[in-house]
A protein has these predicted regions:
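Surface beta-strand/loop "capping" patches
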Residues: 185-215, 312-317
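Active-site mouth of glycoside hydrolases
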Residues: 113, 127-130, 134, 143, ...
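Accessory beta-strand-rich segments of carbohydrate-active enzymes
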Residues: 2, 39-45, 71-191, 214, ...
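Conserved, mostly hydrophobic/aromatic
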Residues: 38, 116, 181, 285, ...
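Short strand-turn-strand beta-turns centered on an Asx-Gly dipeptide
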Residues: 113-119, 292-293, 321-322
Length: 601
């Protein structure tokens, strides 16, 4: 495979890697980024190595060019990371503060050790986790060890588009630390979580603040238990420039102050003159939360996604703030040639989102991957709607059934039930339980982001099971968003959408009374831009001779989409945003250097 680089990968400052504050919805002043050079080693046995093989640039996976390693972690191996760090002024004997160690994501299972102590085990390659290391931390020369195991696509764990034997619509498998690692100093009792739910009809924002007392009641004294929580909301604003650290947010011009007696209780705060969030004016309300000695900055937006039938129409339409919005989306795999899952920089993420909007898209479907939280923050502040996929898992996919057979059944309008665990790769009970846990954690992680309009539970039958039960779980956890329960096929008749994929046939929809019609994947036309392809082999859904041919076929297909809108079509999603390895059907090339489809309306 030819190694391509984006401009951000070429210009990466390896001494300052992804240093922006990684959690925009709960920001604090006192933090330390641990990205940078770590020691690494591969082993066959689960035994900490005495010697390390070299240095790896965290948070880039060892399979990537930017990591400096360029080696695949195999299912029968372990990957070990090591680095030292200091905590100036830290004195654990005083017990006045805590040190939290955060990992944005580690693929797939890992164990964390601090100064020889095993402090955390975690499984789930797409979700963040933290560990309180106060008990074992010292002022200087702390040793941090992370041991990683990644079975990739050989097990039922979540894997997205990763495949050890990559090809076609599946891409190079990656492993290990792939999102930011960071430390945070907090008081003994600190703000653990902030939840926000806007209500534009009532003109209120509902906020719930949870403290560390909620999860550590035995070790918190009575005084800490009763600490009041103060919330100050700032006037709404537009943020064309990104916030990279909490000190950039002024606490002046506050709208409202509220005091809560205890944590874990919802409070309703009136917003008298609301500024609505939309794609043209994505207003954000920053607010400050104080709990004793702890202070955090967060934000929310006033907006509402809904399905409504408008006057003189018989179809349900997707609405934003009560107004019909045709969601013209693009499928985004979130891959980078030099760094796979990890965006090479904050600017790289911003480029993708801004160019999506320039192209004419007002929505992006994040496909089978959970991005770093800053990606969603940029969607919030720049004003683009997000459909978020749950990450697929399950055993080896039987493509003769879930891909080729399902395409034909969908065209023939023959329904297929989700009661065949062997055919749908969901025989393992442990895998089903793991999917449910990760689905819940995904909603909890991303639920505050105003840009997210819909949760996509299953894609094309990959690991699909108990679809109606999963839909009920999601609806209970988040009743304020839309649900695509089965994107593509294996529709079980629930959720908010009749969701079709159509790459090969004449475009059509099946209008329903209870659900909106969406074309959740279409297009996928392939064109190889000379000098900008990672592989010689080509994959896509219709091969174009040149850029002009691609543009012609795209516009013809887009015209077909537009003709379906009066018939009830509410959203469409073009495949895809960029080329990825063999799949050269992007609006942009893999290296983001050549636009293959010009902006359209």
């Amino acid at each position: 495979m030819k190694q391509l680089y984006t401009r951000w990968g070429k210009n990466l400052d390896r001494d300052h890697v992804l240093e922006e504050y990684p959690r925009p919805l709960l920001m604090r002043e006192d933090y330390q980024i641990l990205n940078g050079w770590w020691d690494y080693a591969f082993t066959i046995d689960y035994k900490q190595p005495q010697q390390y093989e070299g240095r790896i640039l965290v948070p880039f996976s060892p399979e990537t060019a930017l990591s400096g390693v360029g080696r695949q972690l195999k299912p029968d191996e372990y990957l070990w990371y090591r680095r030292n760090f200091d905590l100036p002024g830290w004195d654990r004997e005083k017990g006045q503060n805590r040190i939290l160690l955060h990992f944005g994501a580690v693929d797939q299972s890992c164990e964390v050790r601090i100064n020889g102590h095993k402090v955390k085990r975690h499984t789930g390659g797409y979700l963040p986790f933290e560990v309180d290391i106060s008990r074992y931390a010292q002022e200087s020369a702390n040793e941090l060890i992370v041991a990683v195991k990644d079975l990739s696509d050989t097990s039922y764990h979540s894997k997205g588009k990763q495949k050890l034997n990559a090809g076609g619509m599946f891409y190079t498998a990656q492993s290990g630390i792939w999102q930011t690692v960071w430390l945070e100093k907090v008081p003994e009792t600190y703000i653990k979580e902030i939840k926000t739910v806007p209500d534009i009809e009532k003109k209120i924002i509902r906020i719930k603040v949870s403290s560390s007392y909620s999860t550590d009641k035995k070790n918190v004294d009575k005084l800490s238990r009763n600490l009041p929580i103060e919330i100050k909301i700032r006037k709404p604003g537009l943020y064309p420039d990104p916030v990279v650290k909490p000190s950039q947010i002024s606490t002046e011009d506050m709208l409202e102050t509220a005091v809560l007696a205890v944590s874990d209780k919802w409070i309703e705060i009136p917003i008298e003159s609301i500024s609505l969030w939309n794609c043209e004016t994505p207003y954000l309300y920053y607010f400050e939360v104080k709990l004793g000695d702890d202070r955090a900055i967060s934000y929310f937006a006033m907006r509402k996604f809904s399905l409504e039938t408008k006057v003189h129409e018989e179809f349900l339409r997707i609405c934003l703030n009560g107004e019909v919005q045709f969601q013209n989306g693009v499928l985004d795999q979130g891959y980078w040639p030099e760094s796979l899952y990890t965006p090479p920089s904050d600017a790289a993420m911003i480029f993708d989102i801004q160019e999506m909007k320039k192209t004419g898209f007002n929505m992006v479907r994040k496909h089978l991957k959970i991005e770093p939280q800053r990606w969603y923050y940029h969607c919030d502040r720049l004003g683009i709607v997000v459909w978020q996929d749950m990450v697929n898992g399950g055993s080896y996919y039987k493509h003769w059934f879930v891909t080729y057979g399902a395409t034909l059944l969908s065209w023939l309008r023959i329904p297929m039930r989700d009661v065949y665990p062997r055919l749908l790769s969901r025989e393992a009970k442990a895998g089903r339980l793991e999917f449910i846990r990760e689905m819940k954690e995904t909603i909890r992680l991303l639920g505050n982001h105003p840009s997210i309009a819909a949760w996509v539970i299953f894609n094309e039958g990959w690991g699909q099971f108990q679809t109606e039960d999963m839909t009920r779980i999601v609806r209970r956890l988040d009743p304020n968003r839309l649900i695509d329960q089965a994107s593509g096929w294996f529709d079980q008749g629930g959720g908010d959408f009749s969701s079709l994929h159509n790459y090969f046939f004449k475009l059509f929809i099946r209008p329903e009374r209870e659900r909106a019609s969406v074309l959740s994947e279409f297009g996928g036309y392939s064109y190889r831009e000379p000098g900008h392809c990672a592989k010689e082999k080509l994959y896509g859904y219709g091969i174009c001779k040149n850029k002009k041919d691609l543009e012609k076929r795209f516009l013809e297909r887009w015209s077909g989409v537009r003709n379906l809108i009066p018939q009830g079509l509410s959203a469409s999603i073009y495949t895809q945003w960029t080329d990825v390895e063999e799949e050269v059907n992007g609006v942009f090339t893999y290296d983001r250097e050549v636009r293959k489809i010009e902006p359209f309306q």
